[in-house]
């Protein structure tokens, strides 16, 4: 015979088991990241449910009417099993979101990584094209500004001519003895080229070549008694 209060304990255990199954089903339906293995509560939920079903069936066998709690637990277990089968069929052949290896309890189905990678590559290509166009526009604008600045600047001053190194002047030889010899040679040539007519021939020519004596027109005093000239 059933002890009083035991149905309440069984109902509480069934509620806990149904809550665990509901959480498991919600996690399987959740597309978010999952752990590679089942948790501690998820692993113990099927055992608890099996023990609870065994207890309820044993009590129902002693009664003529199947309790409603047993039907509720069986329905919850069937729903959890169906959800697990659907989740397993959906995740069959999927790959790991981290390593890319196929596994049974994958986060993403097969092909999701390829699609994501293709979309990422397309987005990167579009960003590169947009950045390239903007960079070219900036370069053209900078060239125009530089040309305008060059036009405003004054012309550069002419570069100074290259400095020439002075040439080395050869040392002059002493010109004293050479000049003396040259002067002596010139004097000898001048003396030899003088004509013989320039030399005086005799005393007559000496008188002729002499300069005439200037007459003194000053009146000289005449002594008394001397005849005065002036007549023939």
UniProtKB/Swiss-Prot annotation:
Residues 1-47, 153-178, 191-232 are annotated as: Disordered. Residues 19-31 have a biased composition (Basic and acidic residues). It comes from the Eukaryota. Residues 211-220 have a biased composition (Basic residues). Belongs to the FAM246 family. This is Protein FAM246A.
